[in-house]
């Protein structure tokens, strides 16, 4: 299983997605608001906003919520001002961790993030300490029910970097600048992605087991549970056998 998708697979198995639906909505609304503020309220001219709206649709978020968030972003409604930043650190077993946050109180957030690192046998690092271990990429995930050869051909023709056959899905990787072009071309060819996002892909993976594996999952869970954290990325790998011991 590819490491960059390990956490989403684990969450699915733990059945955590539905329980945290409210938090997912909150994070998407924040992203839509900030994207609209920075790049305007027209998704056709604002790729970041388009991606956030697509994510909202994928989570079946009511249209009213999306429109309200856009209005708030462009100044049509009163709302909180958010600041974006990324914290970096080391998780259990020497794993590299990136934490993307959107906050209205940086002091509160940095304290919370540092505390989660410490309590889960990790430590917060300086800016730049682990970001070089990740590549920013567009990632589109497709079900195994579609024809791989046709998907591969259409993806490469549209400008994708790579198409891989993973355990439970097909993955299309793109340069961030080509993400929307590839996504639109594949949709036009009849390929509907199960998920599509700009993400951080680790260059190498660190295998974890035992207490380190437990603490890593705890760290990921607690980071995602924090209202200020938008995304968390880490280069850990946990085997299926190890996962079964912990479930």
Swiss-Prot record:
Localisation per UniProt entry: Cytoplasm
Stored Pfam families? TACO1_YebC_N, Transcrip_reg
Q: Which InterPro entries match?
A: Integrase-like_N, TACO1_YebC-like_2nd/3rd_dom, TACO1_YebC_N, Transcrip_reg_TACO1-like, Transcrip_reg_TACO1-like_dom3, YebC-like
Q: Which GO biological-process labels does this protein carry?
A: regulation of DNA-templated transcription
- The main place the protein resides is cytoplasm
**Is this entry keyworded Transcription?**
yes
Question: What's a Gene Ontology MF term here?
Answer: DNA binding
Return the GO cellular component terms, semicolon-separated. Answer: cytosol
Going by the UniProt record, its keywords in alphabetical order are: Cytoplasm, DNA-binding, Transcription, Transcription regulation
Tell me the protein family, please. Answer: Belongs to the TACO1 family.
| Matching NCBIfam families | PRK00110.1 (NF001030), PRK12378.1 (NF009044), YebC/PmpR family DNA-binding transcriptional regulator (TIGR01033)
Q: Tell me the protein's name.
A: Probable transcriptional regulatory protein GM21_0933
